[in-house]
């Protein structure tokens, strides 16, 4: 309907009978009927070059009695809002909005657009006196030239404006003859037409005959455009009339009710309260015309359409075009050619005019219709309307200069706008570099600054036209910025349209984020203007641009507004509702507690509204509550219980370590040749979950998982249970009654703000079920009185693969099958383990720790055999306890698969393999003793060995098995230190030096008594059967006790055993009743201070001791332990055989920081302190003199640094290159030094950079020892970490 170049405006005045013909044929008015046929080709002569050109012109013909320009402040806003409400698609609504704005806006005083150029009079052959009707209509037209006249003008329209005086306005006369009319007569038709031609001239009179009497298929959809406009106009007028009635309705006290309209327009209504709600206010208008044109069929044929086109074509050729050519020629001669004195004078006003520029701008300037400026403007407008944009551009360009000189800025802005429109229409091929861009920059700003609010149609039209030109030139960003200027005017619906168009231009410019931002602004404005459908559409278009940007506030705003506006407009879809709920769930934890309560209620209400008939639980509440997938544990069967699972088990023992011990227990129960099947009872993120594990039928398959409330408000969950899929039964038919396992439910769970709770749910598979998989968590989220069924998928991710190049470049994970299970049809044995006695969590080195367990068969299967497997093969003993408290030791056997794993079979002298070890309901007691490690926790010389693993496995008669396991780990402290010294090689005399390492301040009493000394050999280190042939005899049998920080020495000698003698131990006391554990001696030397090539001594001397300790709080503790030292004579023999002194010094290197940050810009030198610990363990008991030396990279003088490779240059040096010190026997030297470093890198602060030269007493030969390598990372940073 609208176009860049306005259409010539033609007035239509008709008689009552002619309007009835239109109504009877299903049209609102005659202008409604002829609207589709107003475009025509014609020849127009250009006044400047006097050349004719063929132009296609579309006439805008309006019935003055029913159609016109709407009142700007009181009617037009409501019609524009109705145009926006017509469609739910924002682009289609804005297109209609622009059409309505262009057609209905009042004409501006600065232009001639919207002024009627000619008038068409229509009478019918049914009129009693058609010529008299013509006379009345001519008089009515003359009356309309009076601006105060309201004759024929509808109450919602402004007074019509005319381009020429009444006498000069061209008139055309049409006789309407409807053949359907019963009074129609061809004779009367011809007679009346002849009278008209005689009175008004043959060229000014025509006859329009309509012959159709039914609806034509050829004409279907021809009037859709004008019908849509009329529908919008009717609804807008009804709303405006309603508002006008409400505004003057008397209140309770007789005062009028000044209620503001729904749109933000704050103007005072000027529409008459007596105006009809719809249609025309002409006295001749049909009261039911609005109903007729909406409901009736349109009776018009193609012949009728051609007849109308012929009438209008003749009107153009003989009436309008000659008048326009004459008018353009007159205006061009009068004002268009005056380019000298007048323009020069006006251009000099800025130099010679009185007053300041500010005062001139403050006074609005208007021009008379016959002034030279308005004559130029009329000429330019006619040239543009009738297809001569080049000539129009020249006129507009000269005019805008004069108006700018006159400081008529509003008129100047309008002329500048049309200057751009004319130039673009004349030369559409111009690009951005060729077009006069400066013309586009200021019109909108000038109109906003200098035009009044009632001129908002001019501001909008200017902004739209300038933006269209910018867009055609490819300057989409500039087009968007130009439209954004409209935000400063009043009227939310007006600003919303401009913001939406600006968003489209930003999107075309590739500025997606700005486009979405402006769509959000537009949506807010549409919402304020009570247009929820378009508000929803703008929010919907903005939604994808903010996806996964983690902009919490914006995500929350978009989601809430979409749900609200979609509900108001009734246009919400389930897909968008799901996306909104997903975003609200994601952003809800970032909000304040009050907002979280409101948003949680919004989520539940949205789920209840948009998903009321769902068959499956919704899967949108993935984070409320949050399921901590890394905490998922699957427990296959009734044991172990949740409180028996060690959470830190993976930190102490690796998966391979557990498999080794499990395999040893399996072979001990089933034989060394039986294939290992595994017996994993608990699967978590640290276990091997690539295989599907077995779970017994008739027992619970339990799933433990942590649920976290991410909100700052409590949430209430009901009926929590697991979701199970992929169920298979023995018959292979899914869905049968037998294949559906029972699901355990947690009736109610409340999570306090930001609280994490561990829950345990289960699946109870029955016999006949072969396989199933847990795939989700089901629950009901309750808010107020509503609850919604929700489901959170449970899918565990395996460990990341990082072996091949492809796996390193892309994230590939192993399969995790911990939530899948196959069901074992045979029952598993089930034993309850109750820990009766267990030691303290911390212990002393070499202390004996006893664990007592009560075992009870609570299952439905007899336990045929049971065994204990441990990786501490040299530090564990096991046995059973009978009813009389008698302890029976079990025999230790090394595992078939690993010589460093020990197994103990729990047997009680049964003679038959069919005897059960533990019958159903039977109870027994067992124990196992563990000797603590010989080095304290955190010692620099402590071994890198695994913790003690205890695994008890048992099996039933049908071959199924189960296990119970523990990791013995705790803090260790040193209680006693032992060293051996050879006194006489011939008599094999030696001394044992004892020291109580507990400080006086650490305990009120610390007394250690030596009970026994024995010799032993470990067969695991040598492979030789334990048949040590010597025993140890103390020189004096005396009671040896040492208290805190005390020392003592025991002198003893090794004596060969006589033939048949087996006693290899000597007791120093006869009063003790202690039964020592029967564990083997240590298998190897544990200290890392030994050289890696040092020999391992299998022969040991064991010292059994008893300690009584009273700590500072008064707690009394008594326990035993056994410490082992190497046989000094075997050790000396081994060293002499190897002829090596490399084990005489024990060296360790430590640094205070493995990683240090230093600002090399502030200080070029970074200092890194290190500590060297050197222990003299020379077997020949000799003092030693050591020298610590720095090994320089550059050892010879060079002529320049450039001759040395960068990797060989000095980058680190030490504060003292040479350090010397003498170390006595068994003493330890502590040397502190500082490295100085110049570059950020990874440095070896020991290793090849330092060497130790040792000279032992009595020898002149120097022995070189190496310093262990210690890596330290020095990073460059803007700050220094001290």
UniProtKB/Swiss-Prot annotation:
Coiled coil: none annotated. GO terms for biological process: collagen biosynthetic process. It comes from the Eukaryota. Residues 255-273 have a biased composition (Low complexity). Disruption phenotype: RNAi-mediated knockdown reduces the abundance of collagen in the cuticle. Residues 245-287 are annotated as: Disordered. GO terms for cellular component: TRAPPIII protein complex. Disulfide bonds: none annotated. Plays a role in endoplasmic reticulum to Golgi apparatus trafficking at a very early stage. Involved in collagen secretion. This is Trafficking protein particle complex subunit 8. It comes from Caenorhabditis elegans.
């Amino acid at each position: 309907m609208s176009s860049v170049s306005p259409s010539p405006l033609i007035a239509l005045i008709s008689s009552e009978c002619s309007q009835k013909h239109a109504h009877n044929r299903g049209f609102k008015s005659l202008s409604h009927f002829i609207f589709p046929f107003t475009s025509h080709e014609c020849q127009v002569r250009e006044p400047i070059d006097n050349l004719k050109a063929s132009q296609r012109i579309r006439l805008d013909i309006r019935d003055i009695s029913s159609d016109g320009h709407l009142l700007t402040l009181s009617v037009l806003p409501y019609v524009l809002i109705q145009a926006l409400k017509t469609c739910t698609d924002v682009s289609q609504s804005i297109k209609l909005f622009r059409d309505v704005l262009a057609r209905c806006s009042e004409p501006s005083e600065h232009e001639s657009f919207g002024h009627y150029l000619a008038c068409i009079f229509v009478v019918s052959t049914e009129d009693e006196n058609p010529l008299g009707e013509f006379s009345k209509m001519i008089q009515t037209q003359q009356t309309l030239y009076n601006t105060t006249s309201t004759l024929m003008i509808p109450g919602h329209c402004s007074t019509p404006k005319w381009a020429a005086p009444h006498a000069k306005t061209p008139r055309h006369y049409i006789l309407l003859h409807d053949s359907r009319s019963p009074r129609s007569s061809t004779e009367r038709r011809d007679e009346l037409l002849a009278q008209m031609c005689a009175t008004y001239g043959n060229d000014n009179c025509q006859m329009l005959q309509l012959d159709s009497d039914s609806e034509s298929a050829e004409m279907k959809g021809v009037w859709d455009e004008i019908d849509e406009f009329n529908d919008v106009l009717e609804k807008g007028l009804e709303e405006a009339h309603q508002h006008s009635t409400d505004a003057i309705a008397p209140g309770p006290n007789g005062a009028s009710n000044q209620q503001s309209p729904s749109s933000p327009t704050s103007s005072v209504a000027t529409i008459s309260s007596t105006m009809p709600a719809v249609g025309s206010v002409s006295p001749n208008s049909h009261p039911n015309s609005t109903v007729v044109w909406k409901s009736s069929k349109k009776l018009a044929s193609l012949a009728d359409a051609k007849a109308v086109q012929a009438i209008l074509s003749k009107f153009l050729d003989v009436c309008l075009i000659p008048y326009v050519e004459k008018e353009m020629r007159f205006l061009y001669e009068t004002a268009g050619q005056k380019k000298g004195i007048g323009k020069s004078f006006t251009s000099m006003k800025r130099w010679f005019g009185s007053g300041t520029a500010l005062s001139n701008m403050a006074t609005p300037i208007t021009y008379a219709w016959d002034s030279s400026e308005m004559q130029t403007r009329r000429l330019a407008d006619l040239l543009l309307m009738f297809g001569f944009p080049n000539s129009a551009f020249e006129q507009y360009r000269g005019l805008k200069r004069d108006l700018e000189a006159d400081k008529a800025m509003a008129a100047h802005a309008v002329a500048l706008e049309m200057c751009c429109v004319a130039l673009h229409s004349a030369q559409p091929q111009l690009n951005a570099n060729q077009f006069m861009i400066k013309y586009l920059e200021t019109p909108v700003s000038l109109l906003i600054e200098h035009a009044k609010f009632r001129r908002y149609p001019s501001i909008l039209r200017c902004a739209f036209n300038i933006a269209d030109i910018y867009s055609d030139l490819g300057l989409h960003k500039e087009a968007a910025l130009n439209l954004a200027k409209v935000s400063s005017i009043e009227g939310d619906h007006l600003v919303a349209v401009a913001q939406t168009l600006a968003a489209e231009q930003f999107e075309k410019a590739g500025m997606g984020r700005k486009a979405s931002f402006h769509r959000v602004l537009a949506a807010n404005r549409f919402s304020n203007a009570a247009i929820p459908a378009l508000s929803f559409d703008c929010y919907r278009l903005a939604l994808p641009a903010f996806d996964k940007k983690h902009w919490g506030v914006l995500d929350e705003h978009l989601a809430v507004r979409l749900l609200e506006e979609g509900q108001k407009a009734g246009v919400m879809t389930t897909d968008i509702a799901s996306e909104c709920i997903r975003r609200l769930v994601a952003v809800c934890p970032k909000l304040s507690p009050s907002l979280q309560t409101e948003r949680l209620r919004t989520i539940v209400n949205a789920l209840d509204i948009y998903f009321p008939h769902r068959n499956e639980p919704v899967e949108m509440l993935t984070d409320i509550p949050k399921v901590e997938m890394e905490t998922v544990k699957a427990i296959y069967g009734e044991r172990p219980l949740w409180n028996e699972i060690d959470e830190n088990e993976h930190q102490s023992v690796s998966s391979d370590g557990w498999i080794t011990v499990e395999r040893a227990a399996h072979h001990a129960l089933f034989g060394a040749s039986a294939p290992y099947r595994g017996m994993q009872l608990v699967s978590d993120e640290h276990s091997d979950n690539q295989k599907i594990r077995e779970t017994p039928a008739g027992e619970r398959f339990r799933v433990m998982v942590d649920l976290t409330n991410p909100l700052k408000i409590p949430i209430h969950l009901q009926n929590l249970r697991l979701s199970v899929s992929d169920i298979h039964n023995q018959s292979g038919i899914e869905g049968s009654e037998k294949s559906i396992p029972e699901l355990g439910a947690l009736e109610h769970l409340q999570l306090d703000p930001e609280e994490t709770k561990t829950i345990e749910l289960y699946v109870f598979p029955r016999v006949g079920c072969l396989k199933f998989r847990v795939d989700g968590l089901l629950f009901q989220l309750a808010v107020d009185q509503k609850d919604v069924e929700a489901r959170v998928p449970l899918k565990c991710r395996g460990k990341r693969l990082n072996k091949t190049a492809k796996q390193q470049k892309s994230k590939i994970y192993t399969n995790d099958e911990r939530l899948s299970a196959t069901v074992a049809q045979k029952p598993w044995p089930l034993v309850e383990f109750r820990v009766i006695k267990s030691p303290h969590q911390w212990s002393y080195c070499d202390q004996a720790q006893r664990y007592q367990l009560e075992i009870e068969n609570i299952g439905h299967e007899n336990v045929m055999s049971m065994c204990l497997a441990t990786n501490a093969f040299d530090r564990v003993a096991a046995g059973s306890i009978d009813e009389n408290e008698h302890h029976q030791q079990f025999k230790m056997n090394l595992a078939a698969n690993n010589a460093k794993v020990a197994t103990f079979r729990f047997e009680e002298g049964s003679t038959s393999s069919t005897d059960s070890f533990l019958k159903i309901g039977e109870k027994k007691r067992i124990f196992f003793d563990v000797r603590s490690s010989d080095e304290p926790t955190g010692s620099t010389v402590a071994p890198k060995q695994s913790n003690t693993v205890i695994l008890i496995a048992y099996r039933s008669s049908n071959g199924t098995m189960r296990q119970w396991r523990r990791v013995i780990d705790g803090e260790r402290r040193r209680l006693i230190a032992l060293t051996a010294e050879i006194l006489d090689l011939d008599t094999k005399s030696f001394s044992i030096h004892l020291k109580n390492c507990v400080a006086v301040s650490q305990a009120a009493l610390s007394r250690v008594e030596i009970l026994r000394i024995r010799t032993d050999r470990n067969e695991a280190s040598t492979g030789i059967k334990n048949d040590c042939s010597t025993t140890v005899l103390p020189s004096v049998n005396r009671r040896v006790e040492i208290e805190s920080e005390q020392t003592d020495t025991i002198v003893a000698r090794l004596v060969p055993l006589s033939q048949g003698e087996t006693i290899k131990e000597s007791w120093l006391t006869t009063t003790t009743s202690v039964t020592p554990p029967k564990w083997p001696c240590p298998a190897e030397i544990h200290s890392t201070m030994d050289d890696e090539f040092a020999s391992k001594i299998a022969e040991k001397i064991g010292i059994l001791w008893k300690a009584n300790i009273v700590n500072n709080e008064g707690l009394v503790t008594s326990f035993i332990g056994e410490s082992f030292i190497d046989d000094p004579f075997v050790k000396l023999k081994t060293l002499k055989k190897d002829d090596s002194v490399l084990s005489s010094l024990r060296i360790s290197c430590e640094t205070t920081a493995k990683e240090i940050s230093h600002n090399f810009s502030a200080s070029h030198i970074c200092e890194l302190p290190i500590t060297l610990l050197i222990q003299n363990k020379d077997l020949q008991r000799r003092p030693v003199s050591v020298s610590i030396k720095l090994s320089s990279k550059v050892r010879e003088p060079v002529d320049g640094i450039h001759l040395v490779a960068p990797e060989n240059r000095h980058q680190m040096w030490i504060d003292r290159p040479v350090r010397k010190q003498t170390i006595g026997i068994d003493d330890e030297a502590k040397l502190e030094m500082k490295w100085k470093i110049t570059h950020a890198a990874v440095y070896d602060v020991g290793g090849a950079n330092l060497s130790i030269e040792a000279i032992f007493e009595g020898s002149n030969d120097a022995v070189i020892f190496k310093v262990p390598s210690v890596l330290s990372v020095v990073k460059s940073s803007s700050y220094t970490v001290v």
